[in-house]
């Protein structure tokens, strides 16, 4: 950020840069030149035996030719590919960003949510989930009555989402038009139809629903999700003041639907763990730990029950992608890409997002054969200290397509 007082103060106090030099830093190359000479002089003072005749920088013409040679070779080996891939993105600089482009050297890490669209008289109520297999256990929808949502046009459909979600969708190659603001409280008590059933389910209020997470609307699976179970208990007990007396009476018959069988867990594992941990309301921080414990066990050991249509008897770990494909085929699903370690800020100060880059060139770090060769080469290397060897292996495993250039 221009005239960043914190950065300027760091130059003065931490790096002892003279005031006159700082004024020259309006040109980025001047910053690089200054610290280049500072680091070099420090190495000379420490007596490093370095042949400085071989000195170069990454913007030297000769080095740039070397990089061009590398890219030509990678393209010949089909390791540079063209396509559409998600990247960390600075909306201000209009550039892809990776670890060294962010404040604090944070690698933008993101995950793919499945959006499942519930229908409210032709208007889509989209929920984002990492667990599409739990669709068969949905009893209701959660919305935060204190949040101002937006009615938006997404391509040819009308959706209700949080403003934060509407903005994220705009970076994912979707045509977004904001129609109007709407209050979450307006939807409490209304009914929607689920994509897998002709039954109607009710929209209920919940304070744990965050507008900056997913679509700002959540599907409720109280048998297997501790947050959902406790929020349902709060609603049925009359603790939630956003529920009027008529709605309170109507929701008393909502019961958790068990749809996953897991060795070591009961039929309603969310209820069991909430009671075991002494959780008494939906804002209890212990719900995070309860959620992680159940989800981990169900993912690796869970089997889908008989009420999950053609997926009954399959392991969660195997059926998850199949269910995602099924929901997509029947036209009731979409994709939302979300940063998992937000907020991530670009060095310019702007908050980064996930953007879907189309028809761009990428280094195909997801290529399995390339990863395999990299692991073989790495095994032959001496690493000091050896304790960090595993960290390199992890990086090789998680690396995926990366944009070749900033613009």
Where do the protein language model's features map onto the residues?
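Residue patterns forming the tRNA-binding/recognition surfaces of aminoacyl-tRNA synthetases
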Residues: 1-136, 191, 199, 213-407
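Protease-associated
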Residues: 132-217, 226, 230
